[in-house]
Amino acid sequence: MVYKSIFPTFVQNINLGQMTESERKQIIALIQREVIPAIGCTEPIAVALCVAKATETLGAKPEKIKVLLSANILKNAMGVGIPGTGMIGLPIAVALGALIGKSDYQLEVLKDSTPEAVEEGKKLIDEKRICISLKEDITEKLYIEVTCEAGGEQATAIISGGHTTFVYVAKGDEVLLNKQQTSGEEEEEETLELTLRKVYDFALTAPLDEIRFILETARLNKKAAEQSFQGDYGHALGKMLRGTYEHKIMGDSVFSHILSYTSAACDARMAGGMIPVMSNSGSGNQGISATLPVVVYAEENGKSEEELIRALMMSHLTVIYIKQSLGRLSALCGCVVAATGSSCGITWLMGGSYKQVAFAVQNMIANLTGMICDGAKPSCALKVTTGVSTAVLSAVMAMENRCVTSVEGIIDEDVDQSIRNLTRIGSQGMNETDRVVLDIMTHKGC
């Protein structure tokens, strides 16, 4: 689609001059760290990345690979497809990380995979050279420890706190990196305190050339959806929503297109399609959910390129803001957070002010808080679709100046406090839920 190049002035409801150049640059750097390409579900891919680093450090093909994981990593990697393999789960991701993985590729670590490598990986698995187990007595929800052995030597790599954050690398007794006492990435993020108001003002006032890069999320994630329409991935929810049922029940509408595009990209990703997407805060599904509803709404309503850029920036930065206090992994489904971002972007594209964007956030929190994460898997497309449908509903309510009030449930008069209530439930209140979910998943008779 060709976007209009002329954009009307929109200075009302913006705290002009409140943000320093240094703070603006910090925010841009934060977004560039958090919004990056990924192929495949980021938890098994992060494990493959850690294996690749340990293998590179060892300097030889491993004869044995020992992997220790936090419960949340284990949960998110059990039932998801691994790109280019036609297989599900961690063992093949570990094997390919050792055989063809390149740590420089980050979350695209397996993009050089070939059918021959997959066959070789199957042999490693069959020969029982890979051992995967739960890391006991740790508080980190995102923790990956890999030790590779060959010829009497060994190398270890540890990722903690972020999907690409290496905190420890060693070969034998030689320690090459040790940041285990402090997580550099988390410290860096904590120095930048965001609020919804700050997110809104940044998205609408940042120089366009400094934030134009966010358009890559639209290109990559829309392409993923379009590729999914041509295939048969996962539960094929996105493809199904473009067929007979879409027209009979929902009509050929912006709403139905938002659902089909978003779920299609998720279908392909969770089924293990070798299709890159732009992730947000370590999650491809969050990147998809923060991007495609905004893109589809903008395109089908004739919005300008600048409007799309600013709406995408508002959406993605809202997700990053909420994830700062929620954490990378939790018992709370990430689509709750990501769809909240897209609801903000859509509300603004509808002509909403800051007040109405805040209303949309309140409506989202009142509706979806508590949706559990029971691992990454093809049925995530269903949850993503639930999230983005609620995002549209919340935006429509906000534009009618309808908002869940502070006497209702966990909603506070202050939208930022409501966000903190959401993340407190997800990071503290649902810890036992997380444990029970993993227990159920690991004791099923399948």
Predicted feature residues:
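Conserved phosphate/anionic-ligand binding catalytic regions in large, soluble enzymes, centered on
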Residues: 37-53, 275-292, 333-337
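Short, positively charged and aromatic/hydrophobic N-terminal segments
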Residues: 3-15
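Signature of multi-pass transmembrane helix bundles
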Residues: 126-272, 437-446
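Flexible, glycine/charged-enriched surface loops at secondary-structure junctions
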Residues: 61-65, 105-110, 131-133, 208-215, ...
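Acidic-glycine-rich active-site phosphate/pyrophosphate-binding loop
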Residues: 17-28, 60-73, 253-272, 304-322, ...
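Internal helix-turn-beta structural module
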Residues: 360-446
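Early transmembrane hairpin of solute transport permeases
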Residues: 48-138, 144-145
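Hydrophobic alpha-helical bundle architecture
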Residues: 54-55, 297-310, 320-386, 399-406
